[in-house]
Amino acid sequence: MNVWLLKSHTPLGLLPYYSLLDPFCFMNQVDQVKQKLIDWLSSAKKLSEEVIVFTPEVKINLRDLAHNIHIIAHRVALGFKVIYLYLVDIIFPLLKNIQKSQKESSENLQSVLKIVKEQRRSLKQIEDQLSKVQSELAKLREDYLSRRPLSKQDVEELVVRISEQPKFIEKQTEALTEELKLKVEEVAKLIHSFKGMVLN
C-alpha cells in the first residue's frame, strides 16, 4: 500500500498513510523521517514569512492569494511538526516500550504456563507413585502380620487357650458319658420289657 496522506512538500507527506495508523511500523523509520523534516524546514525558511494584508482599496490577485495560502499552509505544517516531534520523541518510544513489555510479558506467561504444565505432570506422577507405595505398604503389613513372631501377650493368650482345652475336653467327656449312660439305661429297659413279653 503506497497511499500518501499529503503532498511531499508538507511534513506529514513524508509518511505513508499506513505508517500513521501503525506507529510500531513507523518507529523503525524515525531517524530517516527526522532528517527529511530538517531538510524540509531548511528549504521552507527561504520562503517569505510575511502574509500580505488585503484591504478594500487593494485589488486581490491570484499570486498574492496563493502566497498567503502557502504561508498559512507552512505555519500549519509547523504546528504539525511540533505534534509530530512530540509523537516521535515521547509517544512512540513509550509505545515501543509498551510493545516490548507486552512481548516480554507474553514470553514470561508462556514460560509460566509451561512450568505449571510440567508441575501438573509431576504431581500426577507423584500421585501415581504414592498410590503404588500405599498399595505396597498394605501388602507388606498383611505379610508382616501373617509372619511376625508371637509377642508376650500373644503367648499368654495362647497358654490360656491351651490350658482351657483339657477342661473343655473333660466337660465334653462327662457330657458324652452321661448321655451314653442314659442311652444304656433306656436299652436295658427295652430289653427287660421285651423279655417280659416273650415269657408271657
Curated annotation (Swiss-Prot):
The protein in question is named: Uncharacterized 23 kDa protein
List the InterPro entries hit by this protein, alphabetically. CYMV_Orf1 (IPR010746)
